[in-house]
């Protein structure tokens, strides 16, 4: 028997074909959300308060200090928040200390600081009753970046940018004349020496002493001449910089000094953040810059005078490691003192080394390091700026390397906690201005923290972030996989990120550093491709927000692959050689082969095994969760695998889902961590279990109660239904499944079913990927899903009186009211169809437009028939189903309602949707299609044992798509069905073709895994043997019921008077320019005319046509379309004299065009005729009277 059995949870055993021993289990898949939020509550929030506070008033006589904060219990439970459309949030109380510096008085007070949304255990937030997710954002990391560019003459120039977390950018660049310039905050450029002089190093010799004598430095000094001898060089430089930053304002050296301090050296205005300081120190550190260079001077220990490295030595990694302590200490440290006019006058410590120029052995180049400022220094220092300039000048000498902005060492993730902290900081900064003003204006004696703090800006900032930020998204809740995937999403869009239109190919493309950090496959098709990514299965964030991936360490001394796991970021990994997880190992852990496949800085090639530093932890660490659920991924083309990963997220939860026969072993972990299942929090014994709740007695005697959700509406309108898995007496351990969630079976994710599939054509019905299906799948509810829709009706106070919910509706038959209760609300369990009343409601009508009959009724019956309009909530088009639940909210019950609303009624309607022609189906390999025909079971082809096939797919869908994984799944699935087992074939470590054929033989199938099929209609065998097997097929959310739409009478656009478009608006079908050409080509003039008039925008014509149809009269001629009038008016507005003439060349007023054909309008001639006729009739009547009188006489 190939493979070995693996237990997944307590309910499933699978035969696994994996060969690689995994030393590290998968981490919790939603920890990117939960850990980040926990860190925010533990330290992030405190840091934000400490950043902004203390606040002093303008005279510095009072100070407000932050002491601490406390989160109290949330007002609502999770369930209550969902029901009441409230947010799941906890009140936050902050303790402040107000110090009066004049009197020494200190007042300490706890201030309510608003309700703060709390993350649920599932990594989501409940905001206004809806479940939302904060998507992590992938942004460019703060730090210093160097780049090169080639101009049109082929000359290479260099550039550099210091990007802070917040604050002004500092840029350097060279031009075609080899002069180096700087730009401050995207303004006009100035020679870089001007900035050096402003920093207090004003002499040309000083500049050459710091940076060394290079062509760039000399050229720039020549360009930067002393223009005004009345000013010192430093003052002149300061004024020049001020003129660039504030053009048109009077320039003085003092104002320029304070401006530059505020721009770069004030921690409240300029913040590199911890990550920016880390990146800056890493880039400008002398150790990385000396690597590979030849030293041009003896390196002497400043304390002992011992020569550590002799001149002419190449600085290899071993040499640098041997003197690392000295490099981190005081080796070659020089102190420079700026002059008294400088922006910052403190002494500057630099580390300076002389190396041999790589491109000219006779020249010496100076390398300046920033001497590693402390990690807590968040603003720039003078040393940082000088070291950056040195690196930039060294690039022209061939020392140092330019940065790749798409490298994941230069992109970091802002997770929930950081995004929230940033919002909170914005709110506090707005509050700070407010507080400072109040402290200065009000009477100092009586002030308390409560009086001067206005929390509105803070609560508004948080509310705005959760409600309307691009990164706060409505959770994708189609199924557990889509939930999980959404929580692990990384978006490069959003505030401070990229925009779709400006993102080029490079940013979107797969980069070698994505390996093990971001999935190269799972990303949307369309405009967001490559901008929205997913975290790989093992990926996690370090404290700076860089993505790490785990590797097994190789002991270089013994050559053994150890079980020690090391997590590396992308730039750390660049220093090592990493072998693949499937490298063959001996029993003792050494490499079995001399040469192994490995990666180093993006180069995949063979390396001698003794050079390897690390080995991958698992083959699936490359891909994301959804991709890791595709069996035989290694046999699929990546484009189709992308579709497969994305379509699994669109699977609809079925009534009775089944886990796949052929899985990857990822199904258990994905279901467990998704948050959709009920998981045991502690060990214990089940003492009570039914469909609604499970009680577990812990070992310490306390009771855990787990509620089971039944048929709750998910965000996407599917049924969120959990099923209990345990019974009384069961022993459960922490982490065990207590109940399956939607799309789960036996503690595993189950997005679809395992039908018997044949690759064959049948009467052409599976042309173009269409799917032919057996009626069994409809009758047995195999692909039936439940969908819940929510409808609500509210009563408000209007000007004419309050609206009412009632049974007493005007002009409504008793038949229509039969399912309403005495209040006028539909009963639970009623079957409703389109147009049925769900909530009877009347609204008072204005008295002004009463007809004569109504006035008469008023006079007879008094005020009883006071006019009301029927504004009942009715079932909309396509909303048929069974009433599942009704919820009533009123002020009397203590429910919080919007102002002006007296009562709110919510009705939930459940629909049971069987699969039908037009629904979309898919496999896991990107093989999607639409159901084209549902064939009676007896007509379907059948196997030799009489089993009819369930689904027929077109074999032509395989070769050109190159997703061969589906064929392998098909055969292995049939073998699993025959053997009655479940199989796990993990990605990149799954069943080989030998394993597949061994299992096929074990199952007693034919050697080619094909079979003879018989035609269900004739009983004759088909000519050729057919591939038949079991394939996992899912039903997708794109259902025909949601798409099919037809319009008879509907709304029109106000401006164009044409029908609206789209199903949601009950719109019409667009008949565009090319469709008009088609009718013209056929000469179908009458059809064309009615399409352009009655059916579109001939306002009067369509009214008359409708009237004629209802009265059964012939349809009158059409009038003038509204668009013709619009066109005429448009041309007139351009100053063209446009007139409409009739056939006799008389001018016609546009408004008269319709009236001429109106039956109700009479002309003067007609009036004359009518008078004559009337007179004639009157005369005849008179004559008849006289004759009658005569007779009687």
From Swiss-Prot:
EC number assigned by the record: 2.7.7.6
Transmembrane intervals: none
GO biological process, one term: DNA-templated transcription
SUPFAM superfamilies membership: beta and beta-prime subunits of DNA dependent RNA-polymerase (SSF64484)
Biased composition (Basic and acidic residues): 1177-1193
GO CC terms in record: DNA-directed RNA polymerase complex
InterPro entries in the cross-refs: DNA-dir_RNA_pol_bsu_ext_1_sf, DNA-dir_RNA_pol_bsu_external_1, DNA-dir_RNA_pol_su2, DNA-dir_RNAP_su2_dom, DNA-dir_RNAP_su2_hyb_sf, RNA_pol_bsu_bac, RNA_pol_bsu_CS, RNA_pol_bsu_protrusion
Keywords: DNA-directed RNA polymerase, Nucleotidyltransferase, Transcription, Transferase
CDD domains named among the record's database cross-references: RNA_pol_B_RPB2
Biological role: DNA-dependent RNA polymerase catalyzes the transcription of DNA into RNA using the four ribonucleoside triphosphates as substrates.
Protein name: DNA-directed RNA polymerase subunit beta
Species per Swiss-Prot/TrEMBL record: Streptococcus thermophilus (strain ATCC BAA-250 / LMG 18311)
């Amino acid at each position: 028997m190939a493979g070995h059995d693996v237990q997944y949870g307590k309910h499933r055993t699978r035969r696994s074909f994996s060969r690689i021993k995994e030393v590290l289990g998968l981490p919790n898949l939603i920890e990117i959300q939960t850990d980040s939020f926990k860190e925010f509550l533990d330290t992030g929030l405190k840091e934000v308060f400490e950043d902004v506070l203390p606040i002093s008033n303008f005279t510095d006589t009072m100070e407000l200090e932050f002491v601490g904060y406390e989160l109290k219990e949330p007002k609502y439970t999770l369930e209550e928040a969902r029901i009441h459309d409230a947010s799941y949030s906890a009140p936050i109380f902050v303790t402040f200390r107000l110090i009066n510096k004049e009197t020494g008085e200190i007042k300490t007070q706890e201030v309510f600081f608003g309700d703060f949304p709390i993350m649920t255990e599932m990594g989501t937030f409940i905001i206004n009753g809806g479940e939302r997710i904060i998507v992590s954002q992938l942004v460019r990391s703060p730090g210093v970046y160097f780049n090169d560019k080639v101009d049109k003459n082929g000359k290479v120039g260099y550039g550099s940018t210091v990007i802070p977390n917040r604050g002004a950018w500092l840029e350097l660049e060279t031009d075609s004349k080899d002069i180096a310039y700087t730009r401050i905050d995207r303004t006009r450029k100035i020679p870089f020496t001007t900035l050096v002089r402003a920093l207090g190093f004003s002499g040309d010799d000083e500049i050459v002493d710091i940076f060394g004598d290079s062509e760039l430095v000399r050229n720039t000094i020549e360009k930067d001449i002393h223009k005004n001898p009345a000013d010192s060089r430093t003052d002149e430089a300061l004024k020049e910089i001020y003129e660039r930053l504030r053009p048109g304002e009077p320039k003085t050296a003092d104002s320029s000094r304070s401006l530059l301090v505020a721009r770069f050296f004030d921690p409240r205005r300029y913040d590199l953040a911890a990550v920016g300081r880390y990146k800056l120190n890493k880039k400008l550190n002398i150790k990385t810059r000396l690597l590979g260079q030849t030293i041009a001077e003896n390196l002497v220990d400043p304390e002992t005078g011992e020569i550590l490295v002799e001149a002419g030595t190449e600085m290899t990694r071993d040499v640098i490691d041997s003197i690392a302590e000295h490099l981190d200490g005081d080796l070659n440290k020089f102190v420079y003192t700026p002059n008294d006019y400088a922006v910052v006058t403190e002494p500057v410590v630099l580390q300076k080394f002389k190396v041999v120029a790589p491109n000219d052995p006779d020249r010496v180049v100076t390398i300046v390091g920033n001497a590693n400022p402390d990690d807590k220094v968040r603003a720039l220092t003078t040393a940082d700026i000088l070291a950056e300039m040195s690196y930039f000048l060294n690039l022209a000498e061939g020392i140092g390397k330019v940065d790749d902005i798409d490298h994941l060492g230069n992109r970091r993730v802002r997770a929930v906690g950081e995004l929230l902290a940033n919002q909170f900081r914005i709110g506090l900064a707005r509050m700070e201005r407010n507080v400072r003003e109040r402290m200065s204006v009000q009477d100092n004696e009586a002030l308390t923290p409560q009086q001067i703090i206005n929390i509105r800006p803070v609560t508004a900032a948080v509310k705005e972030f959760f409600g309307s930020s691009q990164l706060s998204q409505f959770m994708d809740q189609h199924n557990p996989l889509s939930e999980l995937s959404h929580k692990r999403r990384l978006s490069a869009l959003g505030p401070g990120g990229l925009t779709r239109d400006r993102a080029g190919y490079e940013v979107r493309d797969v980069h070698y550093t994505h390996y093990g950090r971001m999935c190269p496959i799972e990303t949307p098709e369309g405009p967001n491709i490559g901008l929205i990514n997913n975290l790989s299965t093992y990926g996690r964030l370090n404290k700076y927000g860089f993505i790490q991936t785990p590797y097994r360490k190789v002991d270089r001394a013994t050559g053994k692959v150890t079980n020690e796991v090391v997590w590396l970021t992308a730039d750390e990994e660049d220093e090592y050689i990493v072998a693949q997880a499937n490298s063959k190992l001996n029993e003792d852990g050494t490499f079995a082969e001399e040469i192994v496949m490995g990666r180093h800085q993006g180069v995949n090639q063979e390396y001698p095994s003794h050079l390897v530093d690390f080995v991958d932890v698992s083959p699936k660490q490359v891909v994301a969760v959804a991709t890791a659920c595709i069996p035989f991924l290694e046999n699929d083309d990546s484009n189709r695998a992308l579709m497969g990963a994305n379509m699994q997220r669109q699977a609809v939860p079925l009534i009775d889902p089944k886990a796949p026969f052929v899985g990857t072993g990822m199904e258990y972990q994905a279901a467990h961590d998704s948050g959709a299942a009920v998981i045991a929090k502690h060990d214990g014994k089940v003492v009570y279990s039914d469909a609604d709740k499970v009680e577990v007695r812990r070992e310490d005697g306390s009771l855990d109660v787990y509620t089971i959700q039944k048929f709750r509406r998910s965000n996407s309108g599917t049924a969120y239904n959990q099923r209990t898995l345990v019974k009384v007496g069961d022993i459960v351990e922490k982490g065990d499944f207590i109940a399956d969630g939607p799309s789960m079976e036996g503690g595993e994710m189950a997005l679809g079913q395992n039908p018997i599939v044949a690759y064959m054509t049948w009467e052409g019905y599976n042309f173009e990927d269409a799917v032919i299906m057996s009626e069994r799948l409809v009758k047995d509810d195999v692909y039936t899903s439940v969908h819940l829709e929510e409808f609500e009706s509210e009563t408000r106070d209007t000007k004419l009186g309050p609206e009412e919910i009632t049974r007493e509706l005007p002009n409504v038959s008793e038949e229509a009211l039969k399912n309403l209760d005495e209040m006028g609300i539909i009963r639970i369990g009623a079957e409703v169809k389109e147009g049925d009343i769900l909530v009877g409601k009347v609204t008072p009508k204005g008295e002004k437009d009463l007809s004569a009959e109504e006035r008469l009724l008023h006079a007879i019956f008094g005020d009883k028939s006071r006019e009301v309009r029927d504004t009942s909530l009715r079932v909309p088009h396509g909303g048929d189903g069974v009433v599942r639940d009704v919820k009533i909210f009123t002020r009397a019950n203590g429910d919080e309602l919007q102002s002006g609303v007296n009562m709110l009624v919510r009705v939930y309607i459940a629909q049971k949707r069987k699969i039908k022609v037009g629904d979309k189906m898919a496999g896991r390999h990107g093989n999607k299609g639409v159901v084209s025909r549902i064939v009676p079971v007896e007509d379907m082809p059948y196997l030799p044992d009489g089993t009819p096939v369930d689904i027929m797919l077109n074999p032509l869908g395989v070769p050109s798509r190159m997703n061969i994984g589906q064929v392998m799944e098909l055969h292995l699935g049939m073998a699993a069905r025959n053997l009655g087992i479940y199989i796990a074939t993990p990605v990149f470590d799954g069943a080989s073709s030998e394993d597949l054929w061994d299992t096929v033989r074990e199952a007693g199938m034919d050697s080619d895994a094909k079979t003879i099929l018989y035609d269900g209609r004739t009983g004759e065998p088909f000519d050729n043997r057919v591939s038949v097997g079991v394939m996992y097929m899912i039903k997708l959310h794109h259902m025909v019921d949601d798409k099919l739409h037809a319009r008879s009478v509907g709304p029109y656009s106000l401006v164009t008077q044409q029908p609206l478009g789209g199903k949601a608006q009950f719109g019409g079908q667009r008949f565009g320019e090319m469709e008009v050409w088609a009718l013209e080509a056929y000469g179908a003039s009458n059809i064309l005319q009615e399409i352009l008039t009655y059916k579109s925008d001939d306002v009067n014509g369509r009214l008359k046509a409708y009237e004629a149809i209802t009265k059964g009269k012939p349809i009158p001629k059409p009038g003038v379309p509204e668009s013709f009038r619009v066109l005429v008016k448009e041309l007139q507005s351009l100053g063209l004299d446009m007139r409409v003439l009739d056939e006799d060349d008389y001018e016609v007023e546009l408004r008269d065009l319709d009236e001429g054909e109106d039956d109700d309008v009479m002309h003067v001639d007609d009036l004359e005729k009518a008078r004559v006729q009337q007179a004639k009739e009157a005369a005849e009547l008179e004559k008849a009277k006289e004759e009658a009188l005569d007779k009687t006489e």
